[in-house]
A protein has these predicted regions:
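Conserved G/P- and acidic residue-centered "switch" motifs that form tight phosphate/ATP-binding loops
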Residues: 25, 79, 113
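Active-site acidic-Proline motif in GNAT/NAT acetyltransferases
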Residues: 103-108, 112, 140-141
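A short beta-loop-alpha structural element at the N-terminal edge
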Residues: 16-31
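Conserved GNAT acetyl-CoA-binding A-motif
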Residues: 119, 126-137
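Short acidic N-proximal helix/loop "leader" segments that mark the beginning
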Residues: 1-12
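Acetyl-CoA-dependent GNAT
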Residues: 37, 49-98, 102-106, 119-120, ...
């Protein structure tokens, strides 16, 4: 799915670009994703569990960019990818109106408005694509994420207890949210 690039002013005054990733972004995007996995327990993996090669990521990006049911966006600041967001609709006809949302931002860029801007762009694109429902999960305790989701009209519809077990044995629930478009 296509995405038209846009520039946004961050809360710190810097300019960020939201754009579709390119296959040549594979290494930088992998680096960003792996960094995000290491900076927070609010994502699904540890960095050592993410072993995609640059070639595999480039192939994935090529397929994703050609997909009519998937949208990927990266956020670039000063030439560096610092976040990514996506939605993936299901190909099953009975559920083709729904899409799953994912979002991650490097910790140094939290609180600057990137999450809100990327999620707003996803909501607008999903609406334009004819989708009528976006869904996401977040790990309990992710108050920053929850604030963005609430602000953009997502509502809680359930909880998956004991969904995440951290290395120290701590158990966390996933909170399930939905937005009707």
């Amino acid at each position: 799915m296509q995405f038209e690039s846009k520039q946004i002013e961050l809360k710190n005054g810097k300019i960020a670009t939201l754009r579709a990733p390119r296959t040549e972004d594979a290494a930088a995007l992998l680096s960003c994703i792996k960094q995000c996995f290491g900076e927070t327990d609010f994502l699904s993996r540890y960095p050592d569990e993410f072993n995609m090669t640059v070639e595999q990521e480039a192939t994935f990006l090529t397929r994703a960019l050609a997909s009519p049911s998937q949208l990927m966006i990266v956020c670039e600041v000063d030439g560096t990818i610092v976040g990514n967001a996506s939605f993936q609709a299901t190909p099953l006809r009975k559920m083709a109106h729904r899409a799953q949302v994912a979002l991650s931002i490097c910790q140094a860029f939290w609180g600057l408005g990137i999450g809100t801007a990327m999620l707003t762009a996803l909501v607008d694109a999903a609406r334009s694509a004819g989708l009528s429902q976006l869904e996401l999960e977040y790990v309990e305790g992710n108050d920053r994420g929850r604030a963005i989701y609430d602000k953009l009209g997502f509502t809680v519809y359930g909880e998956r207890p004991d969904a995440i077990r951290l290395a120290d044995g701590t158990s966390k629930s996933e909170i399930l949210m939905v937005k009707q478009l």
